[in-house]
Amino acid sequence: MTKFKPLGDRILVKRVEAEERTSGGIVIPDTAKEKPIEGTVIAVGPGARDPQGNLIALEVKQGDRVLFGKWSGTEVKLSGEDYIVMKESDVFGTIA
């Protein structure tokens, strides 16, 4: 992957792959798949600044599994792979 470092309070997330088949074995076409709302954090920015200019570090870290909104962030393609760049505030929480 191309080296990418998010700025500010942004994070780079790789979506988990959507299911290809139902439990009954029916193949789901790409047009009918729901966008997964779960992914793995690939890279994190340094954090946001408060009004006094102090750096507030991000709570999520590289490797965390996170849940986020279906329409969160901006989809980008780096080295032929699909990722999402979003603000940390778009993340609902981490998955243990």
Curated annotation (Swiss-Prot):
One of the Pfam families matching this protein, by short name: Cpn10
Subcellular location, record wording: Cytoplasm
Single Gene Ontology BP annotation: chaperone cofactor-dependent protein refolding
GO cellular component: cytoplasm
GO molecular function: ATP binding; metal ion binding; protein folding chaperone; protein-folding chaperone binding; unfolded protein binding
Keywords: Chaperone, Cytoplasm
Origin superkingdom: Bacteria
InterPro entries from the UniProt entry: Chaperonin_GroES, Chaperonin_GroES_sf, Chaprnonin_Cpn10_CS, GroES-like_sf
Known role: Together with the chaperonin GroEL, plays an essential role in assisting protein folding. The GroEL-GroES system forms a nano-cage that allows encapsulation of the non-native substrate proteins and provides a physical environment optimized to promote and accelerate protein folding. GroES binds to the apical surface of the GroEL ring, thereby capping the opening of the GroEL channel.
Subunit structure, as described in the record: Heptamer of 7 subunits arranged in a ring. Interacts with the chaperonin GroEL.
Family statement: Belongs to the GroES chaperonin family.
Protein name: Co-chaperonin GroES
Phylogenetic lineage: Bacteria, Pseudomonadati, Pseudomonadota, Alphaproteobacteria, Holosporales
